[in-house]
Amino acid sequence: MIHALCLAGALCGAPVAAVSDVPARVVSMNLCTDQLAMLVAGAGQLVSVSHVARDPLSSAMAKEAAAYPVNHGLAEEIYLMQPDLVITGSFTARATVDMLTRLGIEVVMFEPAATMAQITDRIEQMGAVLGQQKRAAALITEFDTQLAAFQAEQGARPRAALYYANGYTLGDKTLAGQILTTAGLANIAAEYGFSGGGVIPLEVLAMAQPDTVITGRPYPGASRSEEIVRHPVIDTLRRAHPDASISNSDWVCGTPFVLRAIDDMVALRREIQKATP
């Protein structure tokens, strides 16, 4: 069972940093920094998150994000919010970052986390830039404790296929791949030489005969790119073995919410093992 994480700056009563170390008005422009900031920031410190943070299909903290004004990553609107710190991801449009910097606003960029260790690194980084080191340390301790419980469990690893729109898959050097590995599943992408992302043709997937096929939940509206995950071959594989349609919001960002994704995959692994003679 995943214990409730302490959210929205109320991190289990952790003490706040000295006032001189704390930026008073922080704006986040990126979905992943949005969530880390909501977890670590002190009361009233975070003044805006990106509009994507309110999207329940993408954000694990959509309900919490409703309490914050949103921005659309535009330099002009962010400048008018009068922030003394802007936090964002490394893939944010460089023109926006450069404009804010020229306007005298400090911008800190976060690299995406692709491993469990990098998740704790990003939490620590967020604590440092917000002047909330003790809050971040408390969150890291909670995350590491729950993660260790998953990693302690050993056993045979069922073969799992991550299969998304257009036949896209992710290897072990991605966050999704690390979620599978931590949950005790073997990612078949490695069998085809994928450490990052790549495409597995449908016929190759059929011949691979994975023990489970894991797909993303479809977005509203019809998309040709998603038709492949509804192909009869996929249906046949699903009927033969337990399968899963994952909650994308828990898998997108390197935050403590990956624990929920791991928990789901552990449950899937146990179901497969129970069904295997």
Task: Please report, for each region that a protein language model flagged, where it lies by residue.
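Sec-dependent signal peptide recognition
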Residues: 1-8
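Basic- and aromatic-lined ligand-binding clefts that recognize polyanionic substrates
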Residues: 22-38, 134-183, 276
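A short, structured surface patch at a secondary-structure boundary
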Residues: 25-91, 185-188
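His/Asp/Glu-enriched short active-site or ligand-binding loop at hydrolase and phosphoryl-transfer sites
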Residues: 50, 56, 175-197, 242-245
